[in-house]
């Protein structure tokens, strides 16, 4: 059957090719008019091409209207949406048709039947005809590149290869679904590459720009731009859309299915599909994929650059100019502007410029570029190119002619602008500027350099700081959806977001000192960084919100509204952006007298948000069905491959089948529960979006009147009609009716909600609060009993009754009867036995900020006695800032080697007793003099010290003295030693203390120690000495 279908498709393609190609008409278009050499590409930025863009959009809609079908071999015809009678040249009514389009205008089939791909069969499978793909490779000539050489060499006598080009386009291989043939036939009116030489067999490596930021994606997802890499199959997700109806070698169909399933998340599929079409020289299909990709990612500058380079290589200058018109003024990207500047210099060669018109055009293009990307930290190369461009102009620097003076002024102006911008070339440009000024006149040069030096120093230091901030930044324009916390790539994504935020914060800190001198430049730099960040963080609503908020706070109303508009287009499901946009519209439309018009304007963001959220729920339902179908298919295949072993015992066979069935059901239940959680979150989000819209309409239109103004009641009715709402919508509507209008409809709404949400404890709690607010205690108790009994009847819902019990218990404790309170506590104790009784009892008398039952008043000062701190041997306390006490050594030191000074006795090295070394006469005299001075100091320092050498203090006392903080640490009252001594005198000590022997460690080294005597009211000398110390 497959062979018959393939043969039928082959003969149909042959018939269509023979009928649709008019060779005579192709030859007659060989002498078409050439392009004008006086064309000014810089002026195209101001043109809108309204009519041509409309026709282009129509052709794009035709090419994108076809959707992939499950079976690529079943299709009879595709009817294009455009009128076949309309000539192709009408696509650009305001412009002269380019040569390539005029040559292909006669090739459009007159019938709506699509050209079937030329195929053949091998072994019963449909395969591609490699001979057709390789046709014309020997005659291939590389297209012109963007540059300054050979800029007027756009050939006017290009060989007519449109027929072969169409054959190459039509003879598509079977790995392209038949929708691609429909797209090709529908887009033939825009064919422009066929008039060029035979298309290359291998696309250049710069086909699709692959940013450094692609490491954020899966490792298997993004390959290099080389076509050889694109020939390798990329692992695709196992889904029914790709596993059914697609042959394994149908790469285009598989990639289309991946894009259709996840257009915003599967960027690698987009890039591979573009490479696939370009590698097969299907440039119309590649254009179609580019356009679809850029509708989803309109600020992906890397792909705009790849798109522009493709058109440049094909010499399709009109399409290239259209790309520049669509991107340059809205996408501030250095690489994109570099491509534009190269194109301008290509179309305006300086070698043949006798009038100076080309130089003026190029100069105006540079000025326009600096207005949009001149502040970029990577724009140093463009500044350097501009300086070199000025140097190449007529005139000599330092001459006396008017051209010389003009060149000197232009160079000085360019240098002074460039050295103020923190770029990678700021140091090089400053050195060149220094040589330039000093080469003209040293006196005036020093003056100019001195004036510009502060700006240069600021720019240089700022660039260093900026490089430190952005060292790990991956500056890509291919945005990624934020990973869910805990999933793959969330840490890397968070790091990138933090770097962007630090960059923005750095710009807001005004490091270039522009806020006071040039506030417009300061705001422009911050907005520029926001735009750069939003290229990479397109799907992060918080960043759009911050950018818009900055604009609103700095009188940039139009920029802020544009940020919100673009943010909502990128994130239609973001409540943050929709609410902010609605608030701005509500504030700015206060002058509108008609509440209906004002309400319609404010409601627009809410409607878009709700549509996106409902669409997400539909997709979640579809994904759930696909996951369940995949599980069932997997288990069915497993049962078919490994059926249960047949045994004599039927019970064993049934038990094995039941086990497999139970495993399948468990997995299906897990999948459904996971999707139910996601759908529940979406339903909650939808409900709060309706609530926000309801409150906004209440502010603008009130509660509404039937037939006149919708108001909040109409929003409530719309929410109920559309469904997927939670009890929060009923609660909000009822409370609006009560608090704003005191309308009895609030109670009716609660009654209606109680029937719809009988198991919702939050709704029951709000219902109780409302009934108590209106002083309807009888109905409140009735609702309480009804709700509690219904929830308690199900053991799984018992925990839901706790907040309801707690609320009524609090109310009864304050305003009810004690018997009711005790009964409630008994019921709570039965339902929640794990809760302590003390907590329930204390709840009666406590408030959210104070619990009197937990207070312990201070009755005696003994309750506030501080704890004694005892240092442990494992971790001695720190003594930083405390002076270490020094005591006169009792052992004679040798002047030849002083005794080691230890702060304490811990870990003191063990010493061996050695004989004293003999001292010389001078050393002995010095030692005797030192002893006499120490003795006199001790005797004069304290009148309480006894004669003779004092005994060393015990180790514990030394340690205690060492850990006492210094006097400066005491900020309260000072320590009074007199009062301490007086306290010690009044202490009554037992008379038997003299019987206690002294510990061995407390005994002195001498024999003059006397036993301790009973306290007689007089302080002993040793005690007095220690107290004074």
Swiss-Prot record:
The keyword Repeat applies. Pfam families: Suf. The keyword Glycoprotein does not apply. It is found in: Nucleus; Cytoplasm. Residues 127-140 have a biased composition (Acidic residues). PROSITE patterns: TPR_REGION. Keywords: Cytoplasm, mRNA processing, Nucleus, Repeat. Residues 1-177, 225-251, 634-664, 853-951, 996-1023 are annotated as: Disordered. Residues 21-32, 894-908 have a biased composition (Basic and acidic residues). HAT repeats lie at residues 281-313, 315-346, 357-392, 406-439, 469-509, 521-553. GO terms for biological process: mRNA 3'-end processing; RNA 3'-end processing. It comes from the Eukaryota. Gene3D superfamilies: 1.25.40.1040. GO terms for molecular function: mRNA binding. GO terms for cellular component: cytoplasm; nucleus. Residues 229-243 have a biased composition (Low complexity). Residues 43-79, 104-119, 153-175, 932-949, 1006-1023 have a biased composition (Polar residues). Component of the cleavage factor IA (CFIA) complex, which is involved in the endonucleolytic cleavage during polyadenylation-dependent pre-mRNA 3'-end formation. This is mRNA 3'-end-processing protein rna14. The gene is rna14.
